[in-house]
Each structure stands twice: as structure tokens, then as C-alpha cells.
């Protein structure tokens, strides 16, 4: 059994359940979206964010992804509306990507794989702590945004420029004055369903908001993301690529659309 989970054949998604039984649960993420089976739910509200760019704190490479961490000690950067019962606090965002431009997203739409997927992780402050929120069905809300290949994205470049400081596993650097809503596509249409974290321990506590419209990045920008290493500074270099979990069974869950 793998001592540490990862994405290789010996410790990858097929083995996660050996250490993390949740990974074989009934409400796992990601899932395949089949748009012909998805119903429009007119009761779904629009969602909105009020993010404070000053709440961005650090960027880090943990060997499995790169993550930007926010100050979530009070209601500073918030997500509201949509399918959610109340406001949620932004805690971090991170990405999943492939080894080339033709795959890398975790969710798929009618069989289409995007180059990458951005996850903005928020938690429900009515549960007082992030740790407590992880135990609740409505504890966490994640906005998922697909990345497709096209023109260069100036806002995304600000994030990419910081990657030079965190090239290897274990590196962390200050990353401030960044409001991630600058990355959002113009269209706010979304799909929503009840699911889990896509990384161990795969807790089933997430209300997903998956945006229909992808954000566009260039092939060069994706190459920059893939230039990160999953190895530490003093180790032989190993590229940080293919950090995505394949789609999981939908079981009895219903995916709803905010749009017709």
C-alpha cells in the first residue's frame, strides 16, 4: 500500500481507497456531465462573490498542485447565492492539469476534457472552523472553472509569474493583492451537484458550482504550469503533471443547471 497518495500507478486514484475509504463513497467527485440528462432548475439563484484581493496571502507548491491561500479568519472574501444556503468564505484556490493540452480537467462535459480545471474552495462559517465544515454535507462550496486553449490570459499570467518562486515541492512565497474573480468568465451559468474533494481524504462535503463557460489560456501558459516540479529542490527533477482524478460514478445524484 502506498505510504503517501499521489497520481502514479502505484499510489494513484485506483489505490486511494486503501488509505482513504471515503474514496469509494457514493458521492465522489469529479463526475462526467451528460448535458442531455441535466435538467434546468428554475429555483437556482445567480451566484456572486465579493472578494478582497488583500486577503490573498501565499502561494505554495505542495508537490501535488500549486495553491494560493487566503486569510479566512473572518468574512473577508465571500461567495453567496446559487444553490448555497448562506455565505461561504474563500480559503484557497488550486488547479489540476494534464501532461499535454488535450486533457487535464477532472470533470468532463459530454466527453470533452479541458486542458485544466481551477477550483476555488470556500467553507461555511456557520460551522466555525474549516475542519468542522469538512464533516457537513453543506460545509464546503467549490467553484470549478475549466481552462481551454486559446488566446493568452493577462490575469492568469499574474498568477503564473509567481510560479518561478515555487518551482519545487515544499516552496512557499508571499502572493498578495490578487482577486481571483478577475479569472471568472463573463457568463455565470453553472451546473451544481453534491460531491466530494477530488483529493484524499475525499470528504463528501461539497456543493459544486461548475461554470459552463471556460476561461481561456494560451498553450504557452499551460506549458508554464507544467514547468512546476513535484520533486523537492535537492531531488532529481520530476515534472508536476497529470494531477487529476478521473470521473467517479454519479450513482443516484442529480446534476442541476441554472440555465435552459
From Swiss-Prot:
Enzyme class: lyase
Keywords: Acetylation, Cytoplasm, Glutathionylation, Lyase, Metal-binding, Phosphoprotein, Zinc
Annotated stretches, region: Involved in proton transfer: 64-67
Reactions mediated catalytically: hydrogencarbonate + H(+) = CO2 + H2O
SMART domains for the chain: Carb_anhydrase
Enzyme Commission number(s) of this protein: 4.2.1.1
PANTHER family reported for this sequence: CARBONIC ANHYDRASE, CARBONIC ANHYDRASE 3
Protein name: Carbonic anhydrase 3
Species this chain originates from: Homo sapiens (Human)
Lineage: Eukaryota, Metazoa, Chordata, Craniata, Vertebrata
UniProt gene name: CA3
Amino acid at each position: 500500500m502506498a505510504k503517501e497518495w499521489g497520481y502514479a500507478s502505484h499510489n494513484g486514484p485506483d489505490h486511494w481507497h486503501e488509505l482513504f475509504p471515503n474514496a469509494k463513497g457514493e458521492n465522489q467527485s469529479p463526475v462526467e456531465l451528460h448535458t442531455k440528462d441535466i435538467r434546468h432548475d428554475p429555483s437556482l439563484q445567480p451566484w456572486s462573490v465579493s472578494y478582497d484581493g488583500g486577503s490573498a496571502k501565499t502561494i505554495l507548491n505542495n508537490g501535488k498542485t500549486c495553491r494560493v491561500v487566503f486569510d479566512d479568519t473572518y468574512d473577508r472574501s465571500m461567495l453567496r447565492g446559487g444553490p448555497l444556503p448562506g455565505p461561504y468564505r474563500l480559503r484557497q484556490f488550486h488547479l489540476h492539469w494534464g501532461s499535454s493540452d488535450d486533457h487535464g480537467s477532472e470533470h468532463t462535459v459530454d466527453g470533452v476534457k479541458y486542458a485544466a480545471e481551477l477550483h476555488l474552495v470556500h467553507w461555511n462559517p456557520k460551522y466555525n472552523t474549516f475542519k468542522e465544515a469538512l464533516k457537513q454535507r453543506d460545509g464546503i462550496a467549490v467553484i470549478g472553472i475549466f481552462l481551454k486553449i486559446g488566446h493568452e490570459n493577462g490575469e492568469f499570467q499574474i498568477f503564473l509569474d509567481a510560479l518561478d518562486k515555487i518551482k519545487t515541492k515544499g516552496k512557499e512565497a508571499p502572493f498578495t493583492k490578487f482577486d481571483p474573480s478577475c479569472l471568472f468568465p463573463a457568463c455565470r451559468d453553472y451546473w451544481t451537484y453534491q460531491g466530494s474533494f477530488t483529493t484524499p481524504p475525499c470528504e463528501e462535503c461539497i456543493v459544486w458550482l461548475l461554470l459552463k463557460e471556460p476561461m481561456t489560456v494560451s498553450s504557452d501558459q499551460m506549458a508554464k504550469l507544467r514547468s512546476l516540479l513535484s520533486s523537492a529542490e535537492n531531488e532529481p527533477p520530476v515534472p508536476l503533471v497529470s494531477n487529476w482524478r478521473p470521473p467517479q460514478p454519479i450513482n443516484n445524484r442529480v446534476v442541476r443547471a441554472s440555465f435552459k
